[in-house]
Amino acid sequence: MLILDKPAGLPVHRGPRGGASLEDWLPALALGKHRLPQPAHRLDTDTAGCLVLGRTRPMLAELGALFAAGRAAKTYWAVVRGAPPRPSGTVDAPLLKRSTAKEGWWMAVDPAGQPARTTWRVLGKAAGLTWLELRPKTGRTHQIRVHCAHLGCPILGDARYGGGEGRLHLLARAIALPLDPPRGATAPPPPHMRDALAACGWA
């Protein structure tokens, strides 16, 4: 298996319009194996940080089972606009995919949606901004982004969910996998997040 620090803006899979993607790098990451490594989970194009790949079919299946069962411990950092109502808490809000011809698709909090749960805590603050640590307990699409918006503090740069223009300030900070032996990694903040994090107290 491999754990990569995926750059923000690089899609994991090549889209219908082509362009650069992580797939371009998979042959170099094969490291002598005939089978190309494959992602074991999703990571949004605009999110930087830890991405796990399986190099063999058995390992990919084992990793997939860990993620499906919620046993892979994922930690995210985000810089959000505004502040949550208290120092820590849990968002338990189901998510449903919606779409229109004009606006495309997005995820919304809806009682008819799939269960989604995220714990969070405040790590630091600045004028109009808050640095959050978030731990998703489920793996829904756009879960952290929608849950932050649901808290009333959308992620900085998240135009889709109310965080304004600019680059998305969301980092897949760490991953811990209960393998034998255990495996894990921590990713540094990408350059575009460092000023906002420093303003909130990161050093």
Give the residues covered by each predicted segment.
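Loop/turn elements at beta-strand to alpha-helix junctions within RNA-recognition modules
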Residues: R57, K137-T138
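Beta-rich strand-turn-strand
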Residues: T138-T141, P189
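Phosphate/ribose-recognition catalytic cores of enzymes acting on nucleotide-derived substrates
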Residues: C148-P188
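Short histidine-centered loop motifs in beta-beta connectors
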Residues: A127-R135
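RNA pseudouridine synthases
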Residues: M1-W106, P111-R117, G124-A126, H169, ...
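Short beta-strand segments enriched for Tyr within beta-sheet-rich domains
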Residues: R140-C148
